[in-house]
Design a protein with these regions (language model features):
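N-terminal glycine-rich, Lys/His-bearing helix-loop that initiates the first secondary-structure elements
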Residues: 1-43
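Conserved N-terminal alpha-helix of the aminotransferase class I/II PLP-enzyme fold
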Residues: 31-85
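Conserved PLP-anchoring active-site segment centered on the Schiff-base-forming lysine
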Residues: 85-94
Length: 94
């Protein structure tokens, strides 16, 4: 297995099959084109998911020893996400 520091140093530095870029670009698009009706590239709208954030989430999950991570676009959206994970009346400590 690759050492963690090597993995993190190389995170996002893979050749993009679509563009040929070596370093991860910052994707600023808000919407994404799809090959056809009913087929998706996996990215629909930047606020829900984008290629740049997907690489960040993958790195965070690996760093923490998890399988998934979520990066939100703002602190308020992170708070909203946490509140949606619990039923009304639940008690949790932050």
């Amino acid at each position: 297995m690759v050492h963690l520091s090597s993995y993190l140093a190389q995170l996002g530095n893979r050749q993009d099959k679509q563009t040929g870029s070596i370093s991860l670009p910052i994707h600023l698009s808000t919407t994404y084109a799809h090959p056809g009706l009913g087929s998706s590239t996996g990215f629909d709208y930047t606020r829900t998911k984008n290629p740049t954030r997907a690489v960040l989430e993958e790195g965070l999950a690996t760093l923490e020893g998890g399988t998934h991570a979520v990066a939100t676009s703002s602190g308020m959206s992170a708070i909203q996400l946490v509140f949606q994970l619990f039923e009304p009346g639940s008690v949790f400590l932050v």
